[in-house]
Structures are given as C-alpha cells and as structure tokens.
Amino acid sequence: MSEMTPREIVHELDSHIIGQHNAKRSVAIALRNRWRRMQLDADFRQEVTPKNILMIGPTGVGKTEIARRLAKLARAPFIKVEATKFTEVGYVGKEVEQIIRDLTDSAIKLTREEQMKKCKFRAEEAAEERILDALLPKAKEDWDNEKPDDSATRQVFRKKLREGQLDDKEIEIDVSAPQVGIEIMSPPGMEEMTNQLQSMFQNMGLGASKRRKMPIKEAYKLMVEEEAAKLVNQDDLKEQAIELVEQHGIVFLDEIDKICKRGEASGPDVSREGVQRDLLPLVEGCTVNTKHGMVKTDHILFIASGAFQMSKPSDLIPELQGRLPIRVELDALSADDFKRILTEPHASLTEQQIALMGTEGVKIEFTEDGIESIAQAAWQVNERTENIGARRLHTVMEKLTEELSYEASDKSGSTIVIDAKYVSDHLDNLVQDEDLSRFIL
C-alpha cells in the first residue's frame, strides 16, 4: 500500500496530467485515507467506510488517465472496468460480480510477486545448485550422499557461473511442464462450477516435468522462478490476497454515464438500470464468492467516471447516487492547456515524436510558435466538430508528421524544424475545411 501524502500524489499526477487539480486532490485524499484507516485500531477501523467518488467531465480531459496513473501509484489491487460491458443477471453479458473476481485475481498476482521477491535469495541459491548438479553430475558412489560434493572443481564452476562466463553454454535440465490453460464460458450463476472445472483441468498436468536444452543464462532465470514458486505457501498467499482486496482494493468504473436511463421510456432496461441495481450491493457492501474464497466488498473504494453528455448524474438511480458522495467536475481543455500537454508531461507527444524520428537519424526541433499552432489547430477542430479533448492532439500530430514519418528513412542526418509555417503548410487546408476536418481530423 502506498504511503505517499496527498501532496506527493498530486505532484506525481501533475507530471503526467495537465490541469484538473480538483480531481487529482480528491483521488489523492481518497488514496491517503486508505492508509489512514489502516493506522486505526481494528474495531474502529471496521466502522470507517471509503467515500466513493464520481468524476464528471467531457471526453478526453484526463478521467481515464488519472485512473491509469493512480493504479501505478496505489501499489494495491486495482481494476479498471467499462460499465457498458455488464448486463443484468440472466442476460447476455458479464455479471457485475466478475469485477470482484478479477480484482481478487490481480491481488493474487500482486501478492505472489511480493512473496517471490522475499524468497528470491533462497531461490537463487537453489537454482545455482541445480545448475552445478547438471554441469557436474555426481559420481556413482556419491549418489546416496544427501549433500552435493563441494569439491574444488565445483567451486571453480560456481565462480564462473556467478561471473557470467558460462552464460552461453547449453545444458539439459528438467523443467516443470506449463499448466494447461482452459477457458470455459459459463452461463450466469454457474461461475463456481466453472472455476472447479478449470482447477481440475489445470491440476491434471501438475507435477509433470519436461527435459529441455537451453543456455545456462535462460535456465538460471527459469529455475529461480520455479524455486521461488515452490517456496510460496499457497494457503497464506490466498489469505493475504483476500485481505489485500478487502482492505485496499480499488475499482475504477469508467463510462458510468452509458448505463444511465435516457428519455421517458417505461419499463426496466436490463443493460442500463438493471446494471445499476446489480452494482448497488457491490458498492454498499456484500460478500462475493470467488475461486480463492469469499471476499467482502464493504471497504473497497469505487471511483466512477463519465462524460454525461447525453445524460446527467441525476439520471443514475437515487440509491447509486447516494453511494457516490464525492462529486468532482473536470474542466474542458483550452488551447493553452493543449499547448502545455504538448510540452510539459513526462514523455509528452513532442518528446515521443523526437525520439521516434531519432531512431532514423532525423533530428526534429519544435519551435514555440510551432507548438502554439498545433495546439490552436487541435482546439479549433474540437470547437467546430465533436469535442474529443486531448485525444484530438494525437490525430493532429499524426497528420502533421505523416509525410515526415514516411520519408524519414531517406532523410537520415537531416534536421527538420517544425514551426508555425510548417504547421500552416501541412494542416491549414484540413483545419479550415469543416467537412475534411470531420473525416480526417
């Protein structure tokens, strides 16, 4: 679990996302509150429930990007799902409980990686011994000895192995056969039976080994993973993962506006209102059965987001509105924001283009007025056609550098200056012609 302060979280988000200070503050506080809650005594901790967040803002302003960056910062089980993928129980589509099952799977993966890191030193020692055994088979009379012969020859080979002198030498080793991965599409309500069937098929090949020939460097990596996996206690792993999900899990529900009921149509709508009703128990707290055990959702943090262009937050059913108490509105982006997006974030669009062309030996220089012209062009197209936010910059940038990208291999060693004139020559016709803008930009 991340121990970063809200100020540190916002600072980290600032290096990737321009503006939207209120949204960054809200998610930073929510993330810090997860840590604060864990500092309370156990009895009081149960009473403190997370304050779920609803982010409202037009498309392309950074809602999904905030979620992506938050996942990296949280160091906790995190899952981003599209609300449109789910339907009411009994209809075609995923059940909402699958969200918690997927979250638990991600926690298992996270916990396994942590435990394998702790066992790494012991795993490396065991892998080293296995490789030395393959390089120096024991003499027949030594087979009954429990401890391998630590002779001078073995020490010489151990030294060479550690120094990387034997990396390219090929050896034959026994490696565990990969588990048989079988995907079974289950009808609603039969997930438990499906999980048992999958486990049965996976266990059929368990314990089998396969003899393979490979370079020592590759064999060593494989053996370290194998030995580390042997040292991980599966029961403890599941217990810790479920605890991690229940206390630190974060679910990001994207496109929640698409499951709002629109218009005055009567009767239930299984792919909209039905999904909201199914989401209610998860958000307010229930117990979900997963293949790893029962998971309580009482303290999982839910962050929902939507553009709400065709609907409004009040179109959500009242019960769900009440479970999303913190509302954050994200601002539409201006031409100045576009200019900052092109230059300020880590690995910005201009930096990416410079790096990509650099691989062909072409040097690109973006001038101040050139960047301003690109930002202005993207903003104008957004104003005249559909406003898709910062995503428009990708389209404009690709169109601007299309010819250069095509001919880059023939221009090795040259320097291209992208200034206002260059932008005008390549984009003006498209930007001014509204019909062309609609189809090309």
From Swiss-Prot:
Pfam families: AAA (PF00004), AAA_2 (PF07724). SMART domains: AAA, ClpB_D2-small. Transmembrane segments: none annotated. The keyword Cytoplasm applies. Keywords: ATP-binding, Chaperone, Cytoplasm, Nucleotide-binding, Stress response. ATP binds at I18, G60, V61, G62, K63, T64, E65, D254, E319, R391. This is ATP-dependent protease ATPase subunit HslU. It comes from Shewanella woodyi (strain ATCC 51908 / MS32). The gene is hslU.
